[in-house]
């Protein structure tokens, strides 16, 4: 199953996340198909960028969002 979820980037105690499309069987930071955005929870305004067009495309072909990405995308 194809998932839209976050992969951790950054350094120790300074997380930064990419929002990516990947196979659900891959590890959290394993290979991914496409990066469609990023999320920075450390910045003052919790910066979130998301390519809505690509998100809608992947949802239309059957990709499922992780609960965290679903929550973040709903706020945007």
From Swiss-Prot:
Keyword Ribonucleoprotein: yes
One Pfam family of this chain: Ribosomal_S16
Keyword Transmembrane: no
GO molecular function (one): structural constituent of ribosome
Keyword field: Ribonucleoprotein, Ribosomal protein
Lineage: superkingdom: Bacteria
GO CC entries: cytoplasm; small ribosomal subunit
InterPro entries for the chain: Ribosomal_bS16, Ribosomal_bS16_dom_sf
A GO biological process held by the record: translation
Xref: HAMAP family: Ribosomal_bS16 (MF_00385)
Membership in a protein family: Belongs to the bacterial ribosomal protein bS16 family.
NCBIfam families: S16 (TIGR00002)
Protein name: Small ribosomal subunit protein bS16
Gene: rpsP
């Amino acid at each position: 199953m194809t998932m839209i979820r976050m992969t951790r980037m950054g350094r120790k105690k300074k997380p930064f996340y990419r929002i990516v499309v990947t196979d659900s069987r891959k590890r959290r930071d394993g290979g991914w198909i496409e990066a469609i955005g990023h999320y920075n929870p450390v910045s003052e305004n919790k910066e979130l960028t998301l390519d809505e067009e690509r998100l809608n495309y992947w949802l239309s072909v059957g990709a499922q969002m992780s609960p965290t990405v679903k929550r973040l995308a709903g706020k945007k």
